[in-house]
Amino acid sequence: MDLRPELPTASSASQVHPGAAAAAAAASIPVSMAGNLLRGPPLLLRAADKYPRTPKCARCRNHGVVSALKGHKRYCRWKDCMCAKCTLIAERQRVMAAQVALRRQQAQEENEARELQLLYGTAEGLALAAANGIIPPRPNYEVFGSVNNETNSDSSIPKYELFSKSQLSGSATPQQSVGKPASTESDSAPGISSPEGRHGGSGSENGDSESFISSPVSKPIKDGEETPGSVSSLGSDSGSETDKDDQEPSPSSAASRHMNAIDILTRVFPSHKRSVQELVLQGCGKDVVRAIEQILNNSGAQGPNKTGPEETWTAERMLQNAQQLPQSSASTTTPTRPMLPGAMTLSNRSAFSPLQPNAPHFGADPSTYPLGTPLGLNPLRLAYSAHSRGLAFMTPYSTTGLMPTLGFRPPMDYAFSDLIRDRTMLHKEQGYASGLYGPLVNNTPDKQ
């Protein structure tokens, strides 16, 4: 039958089919290798997809246990462990928390400063707003104020002495510092108070006066110890003859206050006699501020050219200005000693009264003490001028008022409202105050 030839064909077909399958498999090998190279190891991909990285507990890791941190902090078995590694972890956590808090505070301060700049402009705008009272000034030295309120006047804060201890070593008993608030007769002039008012004072009005009174107290010092008080606040040597004439205060309070006022005058004006200063103080009603102003006005009335020994200070002139006591003929000679900075520009007014811009004493005698800028602006007028008078572009105390030995051009004799006047209205014969910095031509000061 025809069944035999069909069987070989079927067997042959069955024999050919594995070869074709092998050929097809061989043909598909390069494609699978290329796919494996492009895909990378599938085992790592499956591990990354199945096990994402989660934060682990550091304390458990220190003890060889891996545990997820989520919901584990409260139930950690080593949460109270005090070993070295766990203690280091706690310290790191504390440091990181402090850093985060500091960064938050800095960011908050920067935001506040940025808001203030948007509201008021730059730093100059902030200063102008604070000067006009728009922004309340921040209280300074509150720590020292609270300490001084709790303790007595003799605090343990280190203080600096402005006066030489060797000149005061001859006194038998030290002078006790005034504990009660000082009255107006013990108020000292600005610029002569010691730094004790800033370091140990409570910031009140009588802090500077009390510290000035208690500063010349003689205290026992060690041999060879240098004190910062070898130079007085006036910039001159404190070892003058009048410094040795200090007397001990009487037991009564009024006499002690009077002696304190006399001591202040002798410290401020060491070149004047004590008797003359007592007369001036009595003529001014025992007001130290008025007495200092009277002495300064009399010194300014004589002119700056008389600096030799022939210049005399008369108590008659001082008492005549005080207008309360009869004239006296006591006179002294003044050595060449630098006076207070800006002293010759003061007037008969009190130092605490507002200055009038068009007052006659501003331009009365510009040759008395030429402390002015080349623009002719008076330093005191700049210091006490209001911002509403067209000087908002200048900050208060912008000029130099602490340079009594340098020669400046004399101020112009007009007020701020007359700034358009010609500069030729100056005194033609006025020269420089000193030949140290002024140009000299044949020993003659250069004319303006």
UniProtKB/Swiss-Prot annotation:
Function recorded in the entry: May be involved in sexual development.
Family label: Belongs to the DMRT family.
UniProt gene name: dmrta2
InterPro entries for this protein: DM_DNA-bd, DM_DNA-bd_sf, DMA, DMRT, DMRT5_1_DMB_dom, UBA-like_sf
Gene Ontology molecular-function annotations: DNA-binding transcription factor activity, RNA polymerase II-specific; metal ion binding; RNA polymerase II cis-regulatory region sequence-specific DNA binding
Keyword line: DNA-binding, Metal-binding, Nucleus, Zinc
Gene Ontology CC: nucleus
Name of the molecule in the record: Doublesex- and mab-3-related transcription factor A2
